[in-house]
């Protein structure tokens, strides 16, 4: 690396092909570019469309900033995948029988990128590579050319620390049943969880072996970039840096860097609703009167569960915006009670598909967030200062729920008991009503709201000269020198 203090840091970003990974990576690349670095995002032909328009707008507004896209080939059919399968959205937008097979096949097929990555690193010699956790082979590729590889997990310190402590101590093996609560050993805060809420850890399965590769790659890497801010999870940031992996930089919340209407509206897919009309609808509501319900880009609930949510929302009497993911192959909408939309007209809005989430969360009419506890959604809710109803489904989402309900105390659990990949643990309408009312009404609700608003202030301060701003400075200085 050059010691020239005036040269630009060149960072290559390589996100996993899922919206929950690509959206924060785009935010991160824009952030680095705005701080004087040159950013290069690696992706596939179909996924490049997600990045192109936001990057063009960003460059038009900031002509001196350097950010571009490099497209890698991903021959789906040759790799044993269906034509056009370049994003997890391809096989998670339905509940078909081969979903599990396709998931594993997709993860393993990404190794095809290794040769292309090595050629790029050899010819461009960037200062560092920030590659997704699901690309464990990226560490070895970067080592060949003495390029530091940083890992981006797309989650926070709390879940990383929780998973580490459970992996090291295996406390789930000494309880009487999968539903018996236990305290996660060594983790600050006496956090209680059950075996049913932990993602399947069968290390002999093909996916289990793949995840072992991921963990080994983490340890060999040059460190971790975390989309979080110190004030959100200080005990866990300290624990991670002292016990789990010594080198980590927190630079979030990344969503906060999107300040303009277009920036917020263009994150991810094209919204399934006109953003201006959506905001007009919210403008017609009183401040703090609308609850927003969304389960992210992967969770895919069955009709029976959607029916219960609809019935619960109607009974709660709350104004709402409810985002329902479109399922491929399901033409008839059998998930709505008869006459539901007519009865809630004016009080409720259903968005079928993709929503301009940050725009909705940031609106003054929005007063709460029913969320699957995916890390991006959780952080966006935190940045908007909203109390939450937590409804985790899979992956590390139950850990994230514990952060909200047990540590931050800004949320109420809907009562999900099982980590069930993508379809969700069945929750009755009565539980939906109870959780929504609990997060909106009463003295405890007011206290949760106050705590949530303080966290939003801390999030803003962190990126505007605070902890995240300073950690990014430290990172840039270290990898430029």
Swiss-Prot record:
Catalytic activity: a flavonol + UDP-alpha-D-glucose = a flavonol 3-O-beta-D-glucoside + UDP + H(+)
Pfam families referenced in this protein's UniProt entry, alphabetically: UDPGT
Enzyme class: transferase
Keywords for the protein's UniProt record, in alphabetical order: Glycosyltransferase, Plant defense, Transferase
Distribution of this protein across tissues and organs: Expressed in roots and flowers.
Disruption phenotype: Decreased resistance to avirulent strains of P.syringae.
Database matches in CDD domains: GT1_Gtf-like (cd03784)
Enzyme Commission code(s) on record: 2.4.1.-, 2.4.1.91
UniProt: UDP-alpha-D-glucose binding residues: 355, 357, 372, 375-377, 380, 396-397
GO biological process: cellular response to hypoxia; defense response; response to other organism
Gene Ontology MF: a single term: flavonol 3-O-glucosyltransferase activity
Annotated catalytic residues: 21, 132
Entries under Gene3D superfamilies matching the protein: Glycogen Phosphorylase B
Inducing factors: Induced by pathogen infection, by H(2)O(2) and by salicylic acid.
Keyword Transferase attached: yes
UniProt-annotated binding residues for an anthocyanidin: 21, 395
Function: Possesses quercetin 3-O-glucosyltransferase activity in vitro. Also active in vitro on benzoates and benzoate derivatives. Involved in stress or defense responses.
Family affiliation: Belongs to the UDP-glycosyltransferase family.
Protein name: UDP-glycosyltransferase 73B3
Gene name in the database record: UGT73B3
